[in-house]
Amino acid sequence: LACNGVQITGWLPLVQPDGLLRWRPSLLSVAQGMQLWLEHLVYCASGGNGERRLFLRKDGEWRFPPLAAEQALHYLSQLIEGYREGMSAPLLVLPESGGAWLKTCYDAQNDAMLDDDSTLQKARTKFLQAYEGNMMVRGEGDDIWYQRLWRQLTPETMEAIVEPSERVLL
C-alpha cells in the first residue's frame, strides 16, 4: 500500500468477508485502540469495505464504520506525517497519559474539546494518575526512555505531551 510517499507492507490477519473482527479478553488500552484504528485504516485504504469490530470482556465492543479508500488514506497520511516528525525529534505521544487527558476533555456528543477550568483540572488529575501509576499499575513515567527525556514532569512537559497526543490520538 502506497501512502504519502511511503510503501506500507505487512500482514493484515483474520480478514472476514464483512470486515475485520478482533477480540480481547481484557479491557482496551489507548495503545491497543490506536493499533485497531491503524489496522482499520489500512484495511479500508486497501479496498476493504466492511466494518471493524472488536469484542472485549465485560460486554465491551468497539466498531469502526467502513471508510472510503481516499478518506482512509488521508487519515493514514496524517499518521505517517507524525511518524516522520518522530524520526527527527522525540514525538511526545504517551498513549495512556495523553489518552487519559483526552478521555476527560473530549465531548463526543458535540465533537469538541472542553477547556473550562473544572475539566482541565480533572484532565490533569487523570493524566497524572496514568503517568505516575499506583501500587497495582505501573505508570508510563516509569518508562526509562521517557525518564531520559525529562527528569521531572513539569507543566511545560505536560503541555508538550498533551498537544501531540491530541493531534495523533484524537
Predicted regions and their residues:
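Structural signature of nuclease core domains in nucleic-acid processing machines
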Residues: 1-170
